[in-house]
Amino acid sequence: MWTARHAVALLVVLTYAYSSILPPGTTFVQSIRDIFRFQEQLKKENVEDTICSETPPESSIPNRDELLELIRKSKIEDHKFDEHVRKKRQLSRISYQEYLDNLGKADYDVRIEEGWTEILYPFGTWAMDKQLMGQAGRETQTNLGFDCPFFGFRFNYTMVYPMGMLSFGLPPFSAPPWTFPNPAWPKQRDHSFVAAFYADAMFQWIGNTKISNVFFRSVHRPRLDDDEVYERNSQTNYGAPNYQQAGAQSAANQQFSNPSQYSQNLNAYSQNQQYNTQLLQQQQQIYGKRKKRQMPGRVSQPGMVVDPWLLDNITRHIQDGYTGANGFRAEHAFIATWYRMAHGGAARALDVSQFEHVKDWQNTFQVVLASDEIRTFAIFNYARLNWTSSNEAGGLDGFGGKQAAMAGFNGGNGTGWYGLPYSGEGRLWKLGYFSNVLTPGRWIHRVDEVIIPAGCTNASNGGMMTAPPWGPMHGGMAINVSGPCLRPADSVKVNFENWQTSCTRLSRVRARCIMPMFHKIGLVPIRMSRDGGQSFPFFGKFYVVNSERAPASVSLKDSVDNKTNRWYEPYAQELALGWQAMNLTWNTGARVDISLFGYWEDADRSHFERIDYLARGISNTGSYSFRPQQLTKQFLLRDAWQKFHFGFVQVALADAEDGVMWSKPTPFPWYHLHEWERYYGRNWPIDMCIEWFEYDGKRNNFQIDLTTDFPCPCKLPQAMLDLGRFMPIMDCDKDGDTSCPFNKGAQHCIQSVQPTFSGSSQQCCYDYDGYLMFTDDWEPDGDYTTFFQPGTPARAHRYGAAPYRLPPFIPTLSNYQLDLNPYRTCCKYADHCEFYYWRRMTNGCQDYRAPAAGYIYGEPHVITYDGIRYTMPGKGYYVLTMSDSPYHKLMVQVRLEQPDDTLWHAHVNATVITGVAVQENDSSIVQVYARKPMRRWRYRTDVYVDGTRRFFDKPHWKHQQFKHLDIRNPLQNMNQSEIVIMLKSGVGIRIFEGFGMLDVMVTLPPSYNTTCRPGESLSSSLNAPRGQRRCYTTLGLLGTYNNDPADDLTTPSGTVTRVQNPTTTASTTQMIYEQFASFWKIDGTNDKIGGVLFQDKFKPIYNPLLFAESDYRPVYWPQTIDMNASRVFTMEQVVSTCQNNPECEYDFIMTGRKEVGLTTLRRQKEFFALQKTGSKQLISCGPLLKKEGVVKTPPAANYLDGDKVVFSCKPKYYIHGDIERVCRNGTWSPGWWAWCRDRNLEYALKWMTALLSIFGISLIFVIFFCILWNIRKKKQAAHAERLQLKEQSDRLNKLENERIFGTSPEKTPLIETDFRSNFNMNQPSRPIPSQPPSSQYSPPVFAAPPPPSQPTRLPTYTNAISQQQRQFEPPRPPRGNMRFETSAI
């Protein structure tokens, strides 16, 4: 049973066992006290570590006497220990005796004993570093193993020097003082270098032991090319450094130093190991484990190792200190460490007892170049700086002298110098106490293109940085800002132009702000305050990108297999979207909301509101899909289906407002489909299209302004030449994106650069024959709808218009609602494009006037606006073209300098263009420079706007807007070798780069073409006093633009030099140079020209010394080849290469470079070809009207003067009208417009016509027969009447004769019968009663006729005749006895 006695016995045994292993002379109680004291000391050190101390802890290395005393005491106490413990103690003493010898090799982690783990990365032979030889100039060059961009150059090697620098070229080895860049370049070397401590230094020796060294190695990541997983500290990692073994070696030395420093966990990668491990484990869970890599052609070896863990640690330090490096990942690094270096001329220590004294005069620092072969960061780590000058510089004991040590970056070849604080001032030791990041003694800079410091500044004012430097105009994006160092109590606010936002402090170097919504695009000023908005002493610039061109953080995934499942389709069954989850938050357990934000604008204001949630509180997995039919709508906005027809998809954290992610603009037909069908019915597309058609027709006619201000060019060459007034549409560019989603069948589409007063934009498209496509040629046919979509004017410009904030001047959004959405509704959903094209008809080119173009190229050769060609070998700053008009105050200047020396080491006595500067009125000043040789691997030009460097290497940077001008770069041109500047007046300037030379083409709109009035001359106008009425025109090396070549060569004073082409002779070239071109040099002597637009900080790129010389004598035109040049090429080679082109031969002979001559030849041919077709004034008759089914031959829009158009019909149609028309003098030949009818309908109509014709003819015949029959009847009736009257007259005469002569008829006369039969056919005949015989004749007595009765109108001819017969029937005698009386006659 366990008792107290057993417990006491066990305690005594444990105490005895513990006392047996204690050092001699140490009691048990003292050891317990030491433990508590150690814990208190450890707590103090942990507290001190959390505070940024200015000085690193002092070293605890004992001196030689103390070392010997420790060894002697240790030997005396050996007999008290067991055999195995005694052996361990003996091995420890032996290793300590080797301490000094190993000190210079650093074959263990010396950072721990010196307290440098917080500032230096692992170095030494244990880390597989190579060592610099003690002899100067030997084994200094090393292979980096990667391409390292630095100051615009690109290097794959470096040279390590003891003087504290990594050089990319041989230094001049001149004595201080030094000046960088070297002003004597190129006569003297000006080497590129990275210097953490540029001063004469030497290795320190103690006796024959070297305790100083320079270590270096390159570090790389594993290559993902095998299945073996890279394991840290594995023996199979191709010789990677073993940090556990190095830590054990350092622990073995703890008895010779302060034991408290070794009680901590060894951290081979610097500070915050626990955080680093968690971060790496999290990354492994997300991205998987890294695989190891074997470097090309070799395994890991001293000086070149694989260590992804170290690269991750370097990446984290860069991301923590540099705002904007979150997307950076160090793939390679080069680490060089200068360990215990003494100043040049320092005394050599002879005994180890002098170690402490020597140590106090040593410098230890480190340079790290980390790169992903695109971006490069330089890290300077200063562990200990104890001297600042060398004896060679005149210093004494490491201080003073003519020039102290320098720290910074030199681009080399006269590129430029960037110095760190205190550089060359004798106070460089302060760099070890201060920092531009969070760790004292560490300085981080980005060095690939321009030198950009990381971190923050303690100055009271200065600049600020944003990351990213741009944002979408709809805002909501998280922007990191840095500039001043931020204290915990600081209240940070940032003004984005006029919008103030409150920011969250993240660390001492950065804060995070939420970008506000903008209604404009372009460069806006930003200001930063850390006192709550009372003052804004830190400033910078921020670029607002339009929503259409901004990179989409949320990707809307359209189905490839099923075209119905796309975001713009109304009947989509399933939709998917994705986003980068880690760009939103590193918290894998975070929840996100997915929302729909809609946009709508009326005539007064715009509305940007949340419509609904697609999902709430879902996991941040980076993807989401849903079925629109099963979507539960919350209807956050009432009647949103009537207005908010498009918008954005937003992904945001569900529980924090820490920035959001946006998609690109997208329509919402799948969301509003149910409401549309319920309101409009099944035919909702056509009803909505007609509704828009009627609404748009009530608005102002914006096309009137476009017809007068920006008529479309007639052909594609004109559109390509008109650089200042038109630019390509980004998604329909023959030199870029050719998808043309809204203009199928077009080869190239353009839009007007500047909007009209009403904010509209002209848009023109050209087919593959180069002709303008017209909406009049469209017809409602399936093929046309799919493959023929001409350009249409836009009511709202894609890039907006001033004042921007009001509709319809808002970039992208106004255009989407007023132009793109109606197109989708009418053309895509309703299949009735005719409604859209009736409201957006293509403008013709009848009013278009082509621009004039001038060109300067080669060395240099000039082609004026009116066609004069000459060569101008001047040097300096010259006026290329200018205008002093009150409406167009234009200035374009060029910088001409001599190129590189020839292969036979002779100066080229000709010049090339290396810089262009442009300004119009009060616009921004644009400067474009060529780059030095070896600096053209990534960018071919440098572009500065108002002194700020601008890049065009990303899709959303391809078009940028500034004050009164735009700059664009072709989409597929990633090296900035072509820059186009578009001024507000319509002037276009295209700059090409080739072999370090710039070619400049200037196009002027017709508004610059001015002709002096009668009685005025150009000379009198130029000399007229200001304020007096004068004739303004363009002047300069490109001549005057007035369609008169005679006065092209006019000086500022009005003197005209008259020449005629060709001018390719030495005498003519000299005359032009001396009498004309030299007067356009900007040297400050002519007030009419003005000053230089170029900034002084941008020096000549070839030879600044030659550029400054005034005794330059050009070669006007080479007649023969120099003797030295004949050893490189022959005249026969020149002639055969240049094809008898004088300009090509000039450049070939002067430079001795065949490629330069061929470039001149090619550029000249391209310009002449473009000018010939682009500057030609074309006469257009406009499109011819045609109906459905009409086929025009040729199929292109041949509507220009002299074009013949032949019309035909498709096989199922039949043509009508005139089938051939000719355009003459802007008018079509007379004729009926062609139209086609369906063949079946044509046949039916023809049969119907034939039948109707037959029926009509028959009817006409019947009618004609009836008419003739009626006429015949009338004639017969008239004839019968005449006969009746005649018979009656004859009968009366006969009766009279009988009375007179006494004869009487024996019977009734036959004439009575005939009369009855002829004149009263429709009534029965009534015989005349016989007269009783009487011997006495008595004339008949006629009674008075009865009153006439109204005859009855009968519709038939028979009744009419009968009525007529009754009318003309003679009176009949009475039936009784008739008594005739003698007639009066």
UniProtKB/Swiss-Prot annotation:
Residues 242-261 have a biased composition (Low complexity). GO terms for cellular component: apical junction complex; extracellular space. Glycans are attached at N156, N313, N386, N413, N458, N480, N562, N583, N909, N921, N975, N1009, N1124, N1225. Residues 852-1088 form the VWFD domain. SMART domains: AMOP, CCP, IPT, NIDO, VWD. Its main location: membrane. InterPro entries: AMOP_dom, C8-3_MUC4, Epithelial_Barrier/Signaling, Ig-like_fold, Ig_E-set, IPT_dom, NIDO_dom, Sushi/SCR/CCP_sf. Highly expressed in the intestinal epithelia. Domain composition is important for subcellular localization and function in mediating defecation motor program (DMP) cycle periodicity. This is Defecation cycle abnormal dec-7. It comes from Caenorhabditis elegans.
